[in-house]
Amino acid sequence: QADMSLRLGGGALRNQQDGLIFSQAGALEVQAGSLDNRQGTLQAQGDNRLRIGGALDNQGGRLDSRAGNLDLQSGSLDNGAGGVLNSAKGWLKLVTGLFDNSAGVTQAQSLEIRAGQGVRNQQGHLSALGGDNRIVTADFDNQGGGLYASGLLSLDGQRFLNQGAAAGQGGKVGAGRIDFSLAGALANRFGQLESESELHL
């Protein structure tokens, strides 16, 4: 097993425009002040662990773990414009400020997300394919987006915006069980919230 480690301290890592950093047999660990991975790929066969002090820009890029877990910490994370965060067989943990997943895909067997400045998931897809999806944040904007869990979907936040301008344009929420704890409003005009069993709002 050959692991790969990149430690740049407070420096910037630029891997944009079809850049590829790939740990073919083991884990990948990256520590940097910022990461520009627009249209780039950071991939590991094992665990993929990123510690980014500032902004992580993954617009149109891919952060991937094939057989391990995806463990992300950053000041902010922009996964918009077709960005992909994927842990095919393991969990994904994210600790960040603002998490922008607009028109992006974030998926793993289970998800744990802490985004202190909010989550934007407009037209995005955020899914726990085999287990729970646990989110702690401020406002969560899911207008036109999809938020899913095979098991429990737990959201602790301020407002949840799931509305649309017309039928079929609202957000979609689906899970085995849903447990929302909101300090603010839930807007669901033309939106869908579906639970296979329990639904707590």
Predicted segments with their positions:
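Short, T/G/N/S-enriched strand-turn elements that build extracellular solenoid repeat scaffolds
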Residues: 1, 16-22, 37-43, 58-64, ...
